[in-house]
A protein has these predicted regions:
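Non-catalytic terminal segments and appended small domains
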Residues: 1-148
Length: 148
């Protein structure tokens, strides 16, 4: 059995401890500490949770699937191991019509984002080359593998 990775945390006033709903979940749910109304414009939500992520790892903030079902867009964010401030969630709820009732309120204690802790390769060098090794894909972009 491997030793679990320890990530230290600090809660600011009103912050809610990130939790995994199930032991094998990849991400820790991040909770909104106060009611927030999401609009067309991105809203910055302070979770009031600070982390000390070990060197060689980073945190990725991303949407929970339930947020996507509700039409909420959560921008992906990277938390570097040397950052000690509070985690923020950048979210918006694009409206379909001009009815202000279509905006979504996220209530205190609800979770629309999750935090995934991942390792990364620290010793990386970029090497400028005149040409890159050919592949069967080459420069095929969006939908090049079939897509929808």
């Amino acid at each position: 059995m491997t030793t679990p990775l320890t990530v230290k945390f600090k809660l600011q006033h009103g912050g809610i401890l990130p939790l995994k709903a199930h032991q094998d979940d990849a991400g820790f749910d991040l909770f909104v500490p106060a009611d927030v109304k999401l609009t067309d414009d991105p809203v910055v939500i302070d979770t009031k949770v600070c982390l000390e992520i070990p060197t060689g790892y980073f945190g990725m903030v991303t949407a929970r699937s339930s947020a996507s079902l509700r039409g909420i867009d959560v921008s992906v964010g990277i938390i570097d191991s040397n950052y000690r401030g509070p985690i923020h969630i950048l979210a918006r709820r694009p409206k379909v019509s001009y009815d202000p009732a279509e905006y979504e309120t996220v209530y205190a204690g609800q979770s629309i984002a999750q935090l995934i802790i991942m390792p990364y390769e620290r010793n990386v060098l970029l090497s400028k080359e005149a040409a890159l090794t050919p592949t069967d894909r080459q420069d095929g972009r969006f939908g090049s593998s079939g897509g929808i």
